[in-house]
From Swiss-Prot:
This is ATP synthase subunit a, chloroplastic. It is a multi-pass membrane protein. One of its GO terms (molecular function) is proton-transporting ATP synthase activity, rotational mechanism. It comes from Cucumis sativus (Cucumber). Keywords: ATP synthesis, CF(0), Chloroplast, Hydrogen ion transport, Ion transport, Membrane, Plastid, Thylakoid, Transmembrane, Transmembrane helix, Transport. F-type ATPases have 2 components, CF(1) - the catalytic core - and CF(0) - the membrane proton channel. CF(1) has five subunits: alpha(3), beta(3), gamma(1), delta(1), epsilon(1). CF(0) has four main subunits: a, b, b' and c.
Length: 247
């Protein structure tokens, strides 16, 4: 009887733990759905920054490029190089996808350090970089998964699934598991790095004067850019792999 009661109490404790949330969150009720408002607000801000910057820089292209036009042309060339290196000669149609991923993640990561999110008061929780939330990183990783499945199926048809039994059918479970671990690694790597970076800065600011955490903030900006590049590079590599075959 005591063992049964202990088991019931243990299960109840695990159930209670499963309902715990880290921090407070603001939610909107839209129809019958509960929407995470903080992520939507910060994501809209990042999208507005990207669209506004692009429109201002290239709304009137010049034969002799302006500084803004030069910058965006350099970014485009950089994204093309990354896409071509990872995907191959058929990289062209995927440049917009890889570029969108890279720029959204890059600006999102930097917004956590450069934008004064804390000034905006919310009824519950506080604003932070979109990539500081697991919902955003999982969504980006799932989009990448859909993209490389689409790339493989559109080029090879149903024969695409033949890669799962190459080089031997014995590897079928491992090859299937690999496709599940790709979005997991993409999402948790990005989420963990951005969350850890912001937590370190917050702790240092609370413990020491403002001047001391500044080098850490610059290091965070650097690593944030690297994380955006890693995500975009891996996304392009997965797409290239699905189009060329299993490696």
């Amino acid at each position: 009887m005591n063992i049964l009661l202990c088991s019931i109490n243990t299960q109840k404790g695990l159930y209670d733990i499963s309902g715990v949330e880290v921090g407070q969150h603001l939610y909107w009720q839209i129809g019958g759905f509960q929407v995470h408002a903080q992520v939507l607000i910060t994501s809209w801000v990042v999208i507005a920054i990207l669209l506004g910057s692009a429109i201002i820089a290239v709304r009137n292209p010049q034969t002799i490029p302006t500084d803004g036009q030069n910058f965006f042309e350099y970014v485009l060339e950089f994204i093309r190089d990354v896409s071509k290196t990872q995907i191959g000669e058929e990289y062209g149609p995927w440049v917009p996808f890889i570029g969108t991923m890279f720029l959204f993640i890059f600006v999102s990561n930097w917004s956590g350090a450069l934008l004064p999110w804390k000034i905006i008061q919310l009824p519950h929780g506080e604003l932070a970089a979109p990539t500081n939330d697991i919902n955003t990183t999982v969504a980006l990783a799932l989009l990448t998964s859909v993209a490389y499945f689409y790339a493989g199926l559109s080029k090879k048809g149903l024969s695409y699934f033949g890669k799962y039994i190459q080089p031997t059918p014995i590897l079928l479970p491992i090859n299937i598991l690999e496709d599940f671990t790709k979005p997991l690694s993409l999402s948790f790597r990005l989420f963990g790095n951005i969350l850890a970076d912001e937590l370190v800065v917050v702790v240092l600011v609370s413990l020491v004067p403002l001047v001391v955490p500044i080098p850490v903030m610059f290091l965070g900006l650097f690593t944030s850019g690297i994380q955006a590049l890693i995500f975009a590079t891996l996304a392009a590599a997965y797409i290239g792999e699905s189009m060329e075959g299993h490696h």
